[in-house]
A protein has these predicted regions:
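N-terminal Sec signal peptide and the immediately downstream disordered periplasmic leader
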Residues: 1-87, 93-100, 808, 820
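Short acidic/polar hinge/loop motifs at secondary-structure boundaries
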Residues: 113, 128-153
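Outer-membrane beta-barrel translocator/receptor signature
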Residues: 143-145, 157-242, 247-255, 372, ...
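Repeated loop/turn-to-beta-strand initiation elements of outer-membrane beta-barrel proteins
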Residues: 213-216, 252-257, 385-388, 428-433, ...
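Outer-membrane beta-barrel domain signature, strongest for Gram-negative TonB-dependent receptors
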Residues: 239-436, 443, 618
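Structural signature of Gram-negative outer-membrane beta-barrels, strongest in the C-terminal barrel
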Residues: 432-444, 449-451, 486-627, 644-645, ...
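Gram-negative outer-membrane beta-barrel transporters
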Residues: 616, 620-627, 638-755, 787-788, ...
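C-terminal beta-signal and adjacent terminal beta-strands/loops
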Residues: 661, 670, 746-753, 771-821
């Protein structure tokens, strides 16, 4: 374990010491902590003033067993609906202040999923895995009762998953705590307005119902948004509908069903192009126009027009045109001074101070997504604690993404899963023992197309906007010349088993295993693809279609021990399989033929948790190492082959009924194992990479590309993820209905890309809110980025990090008015 984490001794001791110091406050309270979990009449306790932030309720989304966060031998945090309301949390980026181990690079400005432990995370809905969402649409959070953030790969019971972790969204229930229906309907309506023409209205209602003699509970949610944006050419229009229903069919059989629909219309945001250190530090931008290529006068440049000017396109690989090689250092001015590469030269070159509003988003760009999620659970209760649950789940999206600089894609994909969970519990003098067996089948159908071979960020001068010299004719516009156009499906047949042995002397052991057998089929639609790409695929031995199958084992073993003074040390070791799918849940024929569409990761984690002061104070610290087992298999966009080492610490303290304080610390180092093994990583070259080209205007009409040398482990560090991140939140509620809250995150400086050529500054971002509640009315004002800090977020660091960066939002205001009934 000593070489597992390479931290300074001082920071490790401080993290553990902070946790141990809690015991000094709580020794007298620990003896009664276990007894205080319920009152004498069996009712659940409620810690007033905690906003549901304390880990006193069962969370089944980690192992499937109803354990509290304190009892769970994994690093996990929960964010309640009350926390989200009080702190004005509106998107997944706001969750970083509430949970350690989380931070997100920009995936073209769309909040699809958090980076967890430095790699893209996944989204679960009621414990069922949704389709991949790296940046297909902003994940809605407003209808959630709770969000669980689990760091590290999922338990075997949940199936193949990514290395970093996942967020599980728990929708608002049709029942109250304890399982009964509400006595009468209740609900609320909220209107929100704010900076940059923010306009949003949402309504929710919960209550009991009856059809004939059949009683049921319901929870309904609707949200409509029509907002502008700080950035030029951007807006958000979306409708979200969600419903949950619950009824007892018989005394032993319960039905839970519902779903969510989201219709989102917006845009991606590539941020600033022509990236230099001077642009980041001082806002100094290189201006200039690309040479015209639009020979037919239709106002756009087509692939044919590009190839007519520069055969093979304007993405020039390496310095071979001037006697160089594959690395950026071999490229000189001479590569771009003669035909045909001189077509990359800019004209009318100068400099200007660039507004942070001016980004790569064009007037005609669009990101449209229609998503549907459905579920139906049948739960049968047998003798004792025997339970059989049948879970049906459906998730789909129909997505189109168009960007004027030269990237487009679409997805039309869905997944259907049916899982049976058979569980039972036993208790005797030795302890409590719980078991689960779960067969399941999941079918995924995909249709995906993309267009990225002619992606030229720098042709557009952001001070001017798109012109016929920079606006590309996209494959989704002509329905032609795609880089990939692939259809297919895959089915996962699986069986999983879990067991929990909670011994009465304090030891708790959880073990589990799963076997997945995947059958896959995929085929390119050759007629829709660019002929040159088809020829290149075939020359590389990539088949036009393929089918195949592969099996994969997953397992986990965890243990914790209840020590005196409220301390619970734990350890976990696990191996989890993962399916290497793309941005639209697609598999490619080459991966199926090569048996490389399934890989696995291993996790080693140890930590210390505790809960004191009648469960008013919770603290945890963990260290971990997790890595992919196959270094040569990765999706560079959504499922990288990485090794991550880190430390996570957090505390949550409900001081009294007025004051709640939380804090977190994250230390993360992520290494790209594929790059480290190969010694190189393919990348777009930025201005700061091309150190031997004296004038960047020589090539900004196109895109030099090549290989970044990876000669050491430090070279393989994933860019954009800070080594150290600190967070602190506090909220105080007065007796007269007034409440104040604030949150802050302190983030280390990071490199924007894998080549480590441009450094983004460290920053501290503070958000604050004030609310007043009287009778049925609640008014709230939220100020985000209170100090108006200028900061940046790295964008797709492995590929584009040296070429583009996203300038983040300045200070903004949101005001909302809620009526509760």
């Amino acid at each position: 374990m000593r070489d597992m984490i390479r931290f300074t001794a001082r920071k490790t001791v401080l993290a553990a010491g902070a946790l141990l110091c809690c015991t000094a406050l709580t020794t007298p309270a620990f003896a009664q902590a276990a007894a205080d979990e319920t009152t004498e009449d069996g009712k659940d306790i409620v810690v007033t003033g905690s906003l549901g932030a304390l880990p006193i309720e069962g969370v089944g989304t980690v192992f499937g067993f109803d354990k509290t966060v304190t009892e769970t031998p994994r690093s996990v945090s929960t964010i309640s609906a009350e926390q989200m309301e009080r702190f004005g949390i509106t998107d997944i980026y706001d969750l970083v202040a509430q949970s350690p181990g989380t931070f997100t690079n920009s995936f073209f400005g769309v909040g699809g999923a958090l980076d967890i432990r430095g790699t893209p995370g996944e989204i679960y809905f009621r414990g069922m895995r949704r389709l991949d969402n790296p940046g297909n649409y902003p994940t809605p959070i407003g209808a959630s009762e709770r969000i669980d953030i689990v760091r590290g790969p999922a338990s075997p019971i949940y199936g193949p998953s990514k290395t970093g972790g996942y967020m599980n969204f728990v929708p608002k229930s049709a029942r109250v705590q304890g399982g009964s229906y509400l006595a009468s309907p209740e609900g609320e309506v909220t209107m929100t307005g704010g900076s940059w023409r923010k306009a949003d209205i949402k309504a929710e209602m919960r209550g009991p119902g009856k059809i004939g003699t059949q009683e049921f509970g319901y929870s309904l949610f609707a949200e409509v948004e029509d907002s502008g944006s700080y950035y030029d050419n951007m807006s958000t229009r979306q409708t979200i509908l969600q419903g949950s229903f619950d009824t007892d069919l018989t005394p032993n059989l319960r039905l839970e069903f519902g779903g969510m629909y989201q219709n989102y219309k917006g845009q991606q945001n590539g941020g600033w192009n022509r990236l230099t250190q001077d642009l980041v530090d001082n806002g100094t931008y290189i201006t200039g126009s690309a040479k015209p290529l639009d020979t037919n006068g239709d106002g756009q440049i087509s692939q044919g027009e590009i190839n007519a000017a520069v055969p093979g396109g304007m993405s020039i690989f390496g310095g071979f045109a001037c006697g160089g090689g594959v690395f950026a250092s071999s490229i000189t001015d001479a590569c771009f001074t003669s035909s045909p590469n001189s077509a990359l030269n800019l004209t009318n070159v100068g400099t200007a101070k660039l507004s942070r509003r001016k980004t790569l988003t064009g007037k005609n760009d669009r990101l449209d997504n229609k998503g549907s999620t459905l579920y139906a659970d049948l739960i049968w209760k047998g003798a004792g604690d025997l339970e059989i649950k049948n879970q049906f789940f459906f998730d789909s999206y129909d997505n189109i993404n168009e960007n004027s600089y030269g990237f487009s894609q679409f997805h039309d994909s869905y997944a259907i899963e049916n899982k049976v969970v058979i569980s039972d519990k036993f208790e005797n003098d030795i302890g409590k023992f719980a078991f689960q067996v779960s067969p399941s089948i999941r079918y995924t159908n995909f249709k995906h197309g993309d267009d990225f071979n002619y992606e030229y960020f720098h042709r557009v001068d952001l001070t001017v906007g798109y012109t016929p010299a920079s606006d590309r004719l996209l494959s989704t516009e002509c329905d032609c010349d795609y880089t990939n156009y692939v259809t297919g499906h895959y089915t996962d047949y699986s069986i999983a088993a879990l067991a929990d042995f909670d011994f009465s002397f304090g030891l708790d052991v959880t073990v589990g295993a799963r076997y997945d057998y995947l059958k896959a089929k995929s085929a390119y639609n050759i007629g829709k693809m660019e002929a040159a790409q088809v020829a290149s695929n075939r020359a590389d031995g990539i088949p036009d279609s393929a089918s195949g199958n592969k099996g994969a084992w997953s397992w986990s073993a965890s243990a914790n021990y209840k020590l005196p003074y409220g301390l619970i040390p734990y350890a976990t070791i696990a191996r989890q399989s993962t399916v290497i799918a793309g941005q639209g849940a697609e598999l490619y024929p080459g991966d199926i033929a090569g048996q490389t569409f399934v890989s696995a990761s291993k996790l080693y984690e140890g930590g210390l948790k505790g809960s004191w002061l009648d469960d008013r104070l919770y603290a945890a610290v963990s260290i971990y190492k997790q890595k992919r087992t196959d270094y040569n298999i990765q999706s560079v966009t959504v499922n990288q082959s990485v090794e991550t080492k880190g430390l996570e610490a957090e505390f949550r303290w409900s001081v009294d009924k007025h004051l709640l304080i939380t804090g977190g610390y994250t230390r993360t180092k992520v290494y790209n194992l594929t790059a480290l093994t190969n010694g190189t990583l393919f990348s777009f070259f930025g201005i700061e990479d091309l150190v031997n080209v004296s004038d960047p205007s020589l090539y900004l009409g196109g895109q030099p590309i090549g290989l970044v040398p990876i000669t050491s482990k430090s070279d393989s560090r994933r860019a954009g993820i800070p080594t150290n991140l600190y967070s602190l939140t506090a909220t105080y509620a007065f007796d007269n209905g007034l409440a104040l809250s604030a949150s802050g995150v302190k983030v280390d400086s990071v490199y924007s890309g894998q080549s480590q050529a441009v450094k983004l500054p460290a920053y501290t971002k503070i958000d604050a809110a004030i609310s007043y509640e009287t009778g049925p009315w609640l008014a709230r004002l939220v100020v985000k980025n209170v100090t108006d800090k200028k900061y940046f977020r790295a964008n797709f660091t492995e590929l584009f990090g040296s070429t583009i960066v996203l300038p983040e939002l300045p200070r903004s205001f949101q005001a909302s008015l809620t009526y509760k009934f």
